[in-house]
C-alpha cells in the first residue's frame, strides 16, 4: 500500500513511495499476514473478473504484478529479445515466462530438476536448463550461439548472480527482485563497463500493472501455477514445503471458520 499523495505516487511510481507498506509485514502490531479478513483502502484493491477464481487471483496477483513490473516496467522487453527467466517454476518465474512470451520474446528458463524443467516448457519456455548443474550457464551460451541474452530475470541471488551477469549481451539488462540463496555476490566489474550492462532493481509494481496481469489472466494468456491449496490449519506444512523446495508455483491458503 502506498500513500497515494506524494510526488512519486501521483506520477505513477507508487512502488517507490517512501511511505509504502507491505500488508502483513509493516501494517499493524504483529508480523505476518495470515488472517481471514483484511481492512484496507479501496484504491489498493483490484476487481477480480467473473471468470477468474479467487484461488487463481490469489496465486497470480503479487507475483504477477512483480514480474510485470520487472519485465515491462523496468527492463522494457520487446518482441524478438532473448529473455532468461531464472527459477521458472517459482511463483514469480512462472508468470515471468508467460509475460515474456506474451511480448513475443524467446524465453530460456531455468529450473532445479526434470519435473520443474518440463513444467517450464509447458508454461511456454522455448528452452530450459538446470541451474543446479555447475555448467548451466555454458548451456545458455550454447542455446544463444554465444550471443548471450538481452534480459535476465533474476531473483535467485548469490549462487547464480555472477554467471547471469556474464551471460548478458552488450547493452543487456539484468533486473533483480530477490536473493533467495544469499544477498552478497561477487561479480567481474569488467562486464559492466566493457559491455555497457544495465543492472536494475525492482520490487512489486503499480495498481495499473496489477490490473494488466488480472486482465491477461482473464483472457487465458497468463495461467497461474498453483502447487497446493491448503487450509489455514496446514500453514506450517506449506512453509516446510517452500523451505525444502518441494513446490512448483504458489501455495494458496483458504480461510476457515473459527
Go through the PLM ranges and name each one:
Residues 1-45:
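Glycine-rich phosphate/adenylate-binding loop and adjacent beta-alpha elements
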Residues 52-134:
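Mid-domain Rossmann-like dinucleotide-binding core that forms the NAD(H)/NADP(H) cofactor-binding site
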Residues 73-78, 144-145, 166:
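Glycine-rich helix-loop-beta junction characteristic of Rossmann-like nucleotide cofactor-binding loops
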Residues 79-81, 149, 171:
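Phosphate-coordination loops involved in phosphoryl transfer and adenosine-cofactor binding
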Residues 83, 146, 221-228, 237-258:
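C-terminal capping/lid region of NAD(P)-dependent oxidoreductase domains
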Residues 103, 111-114, 120, 155-225, ...:
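Glycine-rich phosphate-binding loop and adjacent beta-alpha segment
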Residues 135-146:
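Short amphipathic alpha-helix with an adjacent loop that forms part of the alpha/beta core around
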Residues 149-155:
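Periplasmic-binding protein-like
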Amino acid at each position: 500500500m502506498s500513500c497515494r499523495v506524494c510526488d512519486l505516487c501521483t506520477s505513477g511510481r507508487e512502488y517507490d513511495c517512501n511511505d509504502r507498506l507491505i500488508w502483513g509485514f509493516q501494517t499493524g502490531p504483529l508480523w505476518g499476514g495470515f488472517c481471514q479478513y483484511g481492512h484496507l483502502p479501496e484504491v489498493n484493491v483490484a476487481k477480480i473478473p467473473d471468470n477468474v477464481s479467487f484461488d487463481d487471483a490469489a496465486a497470480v496477483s503479487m507475483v504477477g504484478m512483480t514480474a510485470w513490473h520487472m519485465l515491462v516496467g523496468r527492463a522494457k522487453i520487446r518482441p524478438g529479445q532473448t529473455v532468461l527467466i531464472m527459477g521458472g517454476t517459482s511463483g514469480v518465474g512462472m508468470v515471468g515466462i508467460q509475460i515474456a512470451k506474451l511480448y513475443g520474446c524467446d524465453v530460456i528458463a531455468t529450473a532445479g530438476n526434470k519435473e520443474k524443467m518440463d513444467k517450464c516448457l509447458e508454461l511456454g519456455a522455448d528452452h530450459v536448463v538446470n541451474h543446479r548443474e555447475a555448467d548451466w550457464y555454458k548451456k545458455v551460451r550454447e542455446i544463444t550461439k554465444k550471443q548471450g541474452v538481452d534480459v535476465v530475470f533474476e531473483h535467485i541471488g548469490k549462487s547464480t548472480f555472477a554467471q547471469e551477469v556474464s551471460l548478458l549481451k552488450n547493452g543487456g539488462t539484468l533486473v533483480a527482485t530477490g536473493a533467495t540463496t544469499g544477498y552478497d555476490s561477487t561479480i567481474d566489474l569488467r562486464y559492466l563497463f566493457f559491455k555497457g550492462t544495465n543492472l536494475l532493481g525492482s520490487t512489486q509494481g503499480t495498481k495499473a500493472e496489477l490490473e494488466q496481469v488480472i486482465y491477461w489472466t482473464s483472457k487465458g494468456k497468463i495461467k497461474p501455477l498453483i502447487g497446493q491449496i491448503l487450509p489455514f490449519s496446514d500453514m506450517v506444512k506449506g512453509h516446510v514445503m517452500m523451505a525444502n523446495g518441494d513446490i512448483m508455483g504458489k501455495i494458496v491458503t483458504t480461510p476457515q471458520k473459527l
